[in-house]
Amino acid sequence: MTGYTMLRNGGVGNGGQTCMLRWSNRIRLTWLSFTLFIILVFFPLIAHYYLTTLDEADEAGKRIFGPRAGSELCEVKHVLDLCRIRESVSEELLQLEAKRQELNSEIAKLNLKIEACKKSIENAKQDLLQLKNVISQTEHSYKELMAQNQPKLSLPIRLLPEKDDAGLPPPKVTRGCRLHNCFDYSRCPLTSGFPVYVYDSDQFAFGSYLDPLVKQAFQATVRANVYVTENAAIACLYVVLVGEMQEPTVLRPADLEKQLFSLPHWRTDGHNHVIINLSRKSDTQNLLYNVSTGRHVAQSTFYAAQYRAGFDLVVSPLVHAMSEPNFMEIPPQVPVKRKYLFTFQGEKIESLRSSLQEARSFEEEMEGDPPADYDDRIIATLKAVQDSKLDQVLVEFTCKNQPKPSLPTEWALCGEREDRLELLKLSTFALIITPGDPHLLISSGCATRLFEALEVGAVPVVLGEQVQLPYHDMLQWNEAALVVPKPRVTEVHFLLRSLSDSDLLAMRRQGRFLWETYFSTADSIFNTVLAMIRTRIQIPAAPIREEVAAEIPHRSGKAAGTDPNMADNGDLDLGPVETEPPYASPKYLRNFTLTVTDCYRGWNSAPGPFHLFPHTPFDPVLPSEAKFLGSGTGFRPIGGGAGGSGKEFQAALGGNVQREQFTVVMLTYEREEVLMNSLERLNGLPYLNKVVVVWNSPKLPSEDLLWPDIGVPIMVVRTEKNSLNNRFLPWNEIETEAILSIDDDAHLRHDEIMFGFRVWREARDRIVGFPGRYHAWDIPHQSWLYNSNYSCELSMVLTGAAFFHKYYAYLYSYVMPQAIRDMVDEYINCEDIAMNFLVSHITRKPPIKVTSRWTFRCPGCPQALSHDDSHFHERHKCINFFVKVYGYMPLLYTQFRVDSVLFKTRLPHDKTKCFKFI
């Protein structure tokens, strides 16, 4: 019962709990439903209300983000007042901002005015400084002019001799003839120009006996000679050709003497006559041996009893009469060592009597001791050297065929000329054994051997010190040949082996120069004969001709603009502005010193003694103190001699030579716009004398083309043909020594040009410029290549932007082999390479590169020829052809470039640099 009751109670209790749970669940569900109803009904209404209120607030300029309390609604009016205040402040801020911007604009304008004023002040200071420099320079020039005590020299004015002269009979003994007693100086004033009258051999009996080739070659060279005149009355010198005679004709000395005495201008004594006997064969007769005239004799064979030192002339034989050597047939000078160390071919003529010997008097035969005959010792020694096999030599003392006719005791030539030349091309040295007769000073056979050795680059070794080599009065034969006494024949082998390659090549190169200049053609022989006599009587050479410029009329007046690419050189000017007219370099200051004091250098270095130049880059330089102690005319030392940094440096040229200017030579071809831009860039360039524009186009400039006014004359020169050689013609309008050759599309800053000019003044004999190139060895093909890649070595400076001396323009146009200029015209290329070859050949120095420029870029310029691939192939060919013409590679390498002295040097605040960017 109790258990039942408990169960029941428990059941009743559990049921109550269940009912309570159900009731609470219903309440929760009802509350949740009510809550959801409230949210779903009232929230959209509230949101709609506030959204509509927000729109109204926005329209009133208010932003309402939610419901406000009752107290806040009272403050709406205050908020509106604050908003109005904010709007007012914003308007004031906008007005203040506008005023601030106006003030900033005014400040910027004022700053610009300040900068302009500062710039104008600086310009005024620069102008003042330049004016002070000009005043100083003018005062200096005035003082120099007032203190000048030496007349200004120029091209000599010709003073001609009178028609009649008193005559000058020779001394009783014709062997005593010398210039002082057998030459009439009154007919040859120093400024006479050395007029020469040449007899026409066809008008005289002896002319019919002359060798036709000799006569024809002689007449051709006479027609082209600048000294020859047809007016015998004003002549200083009279020339008559008497040989070589045709075989077998032999004119007796008495007959020839009689014919010479009957010459129309002989004037009873024949003073100032030169009798020329040119040789073509080794057995040429000594036609003038017993002809007693007492006058100059020029021939290739002389006996001691006949030759008068300082009066007669030993000349080269006339081997061939071509106008210019065929450079393709001449072997190269390198390699230095050839197959044979030395060679000799010849056969001794044993006969001691001949028609020539019989003509000698008995007293002459008996004079002195009998000659020592070294020929047997020479033969034995040379054969021993050949048999020793120490060096490969070739000596033959018997001709395979009949030897050439020769004089007694002389070594006759063997074989034909072509065969002898082929052997000499394989020979490092060529032995020349002088005749055994000590009275025979020189013979045609020896002179022919010398000619052939020099022609092919075999260094002559002359055994016999008594020999008188051609033109020995002026030529320093020790630079091109070895003259060894015959008693030293046993030491010849040792002597030849001891020569270094550099010495040997220097002798070979000098021998080539002597052969080309004095031996190779009929022109060179005749010019040398006249030059020898002219030098002896101290008359200067004829002035070298200048190219007369045909000016193209053009309109100028266009104001030159300023180039934004021009570098500012800081507070330094680049030189004084020249207010006086452009001044030319002085000319012909050394008319007579070149002939008197410097004649040996002129005779033994290119181009020889045949021209008088207005100036050369080799003129002597005064010591530094001379400019302050009486020889200061024309000098402008820096700081008056005290030196200085940038400002003092830019105020004067300084250096080791007098003040000077330079001429710009600009080659152009149908690029008018590019040309005008380039000319404008030259505006205001200090020390610029003139601009010569070489108009290379057949079309004239446009008639409406207005040329810029750059402060100096612009001369537009018309050329006869389109040739790159025109760039280097020595135009008469170029009045300065310094030439800046520049392409019409080259961009150079003023400071770069001025620095290049200053460097050139210290290296006047070299090319000084900007773009560098070099020659590279092509190993597979064993030839040369033109290379424009960046390199630490260079050997050329392109003349599209380079300084050089006008002297080289003369050499390029009138002295350099014509074959080189012809190739330049053929390819329309390589003229810059040719100029580098020429200068290095003359000086044996490389060019000088200035600044870091390697090339030039011309944006907007028409395509240049240098961009074509064939351009480089042609330049390869040019280099190798030029090497053949010169016989060797004259270009030399250099491994440095030049910058200004104080470049990248830390300076005190009171010092300035020479150039800002260089």
Swiss-Prot record:
The active site is at D832. GO terms for biological process: heparan sulfate proteoglycan biosynthetic process; negative regulation of cytokine production involved in inflammatory response; negative regulation of inflammatory response; negative regulation of inflammatory response to wounding; negative regulation of keratinocyte differentiation; positive regulation of detection of glucose; positive regulation of keratinocyte proliferation; positive regulation of phosphatidylinositol 3-kinase/protein kinase B signal transduction. Its cofactor is Mn(2+). It holds the Pfam family Exostosin_GT47. Disruption phenotype: Embryonically lethal at 9 days post-coitum (dpc). Embryos are defective in heparan sulfate (HS) synthesis. Conditional knockout in pancreatic islet beta-cells results in a lack of HS in pancreatic islet beta-cells. Abnormal pancreatic islet morphology with reduced beta-cell proliferation and glucose intolerance due to defective insulin secretion. It catalyses: 3-O-(beta-D-GlcA-(1->3)-beta-D-Gal-(1->3)-beta-D-Gal-(1->4)-beta-D-Xyl)-L-seryl-[protein] + UDP-N-acetyl-alpha-D-glucosamine = 3-O-(alpha-D-GlcNAc-(1->4)-beta-D-GlcA-(1->3)-beta-D-Gal-(1->3)-beta-D-Gal-(1->4)-beta-D-Xyl)-L-seryl-[protein] + UDP + H(+). Residues 1-140 are annotated as: Required for interaction with REG3A. It is a single-pass type II membrane protein. Coiled coil: none annotated. Keywords: Cell membrane, Disulfide bond, Endoplasmic reticulum, Glycoprotein, Glycosyltransferase, Golgi apparatus, Manganese, Membrane, Metal-binding, Nucleus, Phosphoprotein, Receptor, Signal-anchor, Transferase, Transmembrane, Transmembrane helix. The N-terminal glycosyltransferase domain (GT47) does not bind UDP and is therefore unlikely to possess glycosyltransferase activity. This is Exostosin-like 3. The lineage of its organism: Eukaryota, Metazoa, Chordata, Craniata, Vertebrata.
